[in-house]
């Protein structure tokens, strides 16, 4: 009898525990649902998308409006320039004393209108000749040539020649003979060799040698 009562009590106890477990599960699942809902809140996605779309449209409209205003300003400048040219022609009694292309060149550049000679300018740029670097020998030779031009005496005038081109003036002939003899005296002597530490340093050589016999 005692055992039967004990079994009945245990059964009733287990039955009373069953609803408690069910309620605990439901509470746990509800809490999990609440947490998931707070993590993945999708209520702000739609407003953000709307704001981004509206902002991009607004920026595009503002940029287009600026372009229109800039274009209107440029065309207004061109119209004002054309009116000025018309007034100049009218004041000059219908005579055109200017080049319309040159006058409108700056305005056309502002409008992005390229003149007729644009392609020609591009072709000319490719034909630019880059000057080559001159060597030291060429520079030295050019200096010598310039010095010779300065030393060359005056050539006989046409008045001292006859019809056949022969010089007949005695004074001119003497001068020519004298200059020819002086030219024959000038020669390059290889007997004396000048040694220097640095090329072109003639001051040091002048200190060592009292006299330089010849220098070219």
Curated annotation (Swiss-Prot):
Swiss-Prot/TrEMBL keywords: Chaperone, Coiled coil, Membrane, Mitochondrion, Mitochondrion inner membrane, Transit peptide, Transmembrane, Transmembrane helix
One GO BP annotation of this record: mitochondrial proton-transporting ATP synthase complex assembly
Major subcellular location class: mitochondrion
Membrane-side (Mitochondrial matrix) residue stretches: 27-43
UniProt membrane topology term: Single-pass membrane protein
Transmembrane segment boundaries: 44-63
Protein's cellular compartments: Mitochondrion inner membrane
Mitochondrial intermembrane topological domain residue ranges: 64-216
Location of the transit peptide in the chain: 1-26
Signal peptide positions on this chain: none
Coiled coil feature spans: 64-93
Gene Ontology, cellular component aspect: INA complex; mitochondrial inner membrane; mitochondrial inner membrane assembly complex; mitochondrion
Keyword Transmembrane in record: yes
Biological role: Component of the INA complex (INAC) that promotes the biogenesis of mitochondrial F(1)F(0)-ATP synthase. INAC facilitates the assembly of the peripheral stalk and promotes the assembly of the catalytic F(1)-domain with the membrane-embedded F(0)-domain.
Quaternary structure and partners: Component of the inner membrane assembly (INA) complex, composed of INA17 and INA22. Interacts with a subset of F(1)F(0)-ATP synthase subunits of the F(1)-domain and the peripheral stalk.
Additional free-text comment from the UniProt record: Present with 589 molecules/cell in log phase SD medium.
Record's protein name: Inner membrane assembly complex subunit 22
Organism listed in the record: Saccharomyces cerevisiae (strain ATCC 204508 / S288c)
């Amino acid at each position: 009898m005692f055992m039967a009562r004990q079994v009945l009590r245990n059964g009733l106890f287990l039955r009373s525990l069953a609803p408690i477990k069910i309620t605990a599960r439901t509470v746990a699942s509800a809490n999990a649902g609440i947490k998931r809902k707070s993590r993945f809140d999708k209520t702000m996605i739609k407003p953000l998308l709307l704001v981004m779309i509206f902002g991009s449209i607004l920026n595009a409209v503002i940029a287009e409006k600026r372009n229109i205003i800039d274009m209107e300003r440029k065309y207004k400048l061109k119209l004002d320039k054309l009116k000025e040219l018309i007034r100049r022609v009218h004041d000059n009694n219908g005579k055109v004393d200017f080049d319309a292309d040159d006058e409108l060149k700056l305005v056309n550049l502002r409008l992005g209108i390229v003149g007729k000679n644009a392609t020609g300018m591009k072709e000319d740029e490719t034909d630019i000749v880059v000057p080559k670097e001159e060597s030291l020998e060429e520079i030295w030779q050019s200096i010598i040539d310039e010095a010779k031009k300065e030393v060359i005496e005056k050539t006989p005038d046409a008045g001292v020649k006859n019809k056949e081109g022969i010089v007949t003036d005695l004074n001119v002939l003497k001068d020519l003979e004298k200059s020819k003899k002086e030219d024959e005296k000038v020669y390059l002597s290889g007997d004396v060799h000048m040694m220097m530490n640095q090329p072109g340093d003639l001051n040091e050589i002048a200190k060592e040698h009292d006299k330089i016999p010849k220098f070219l």
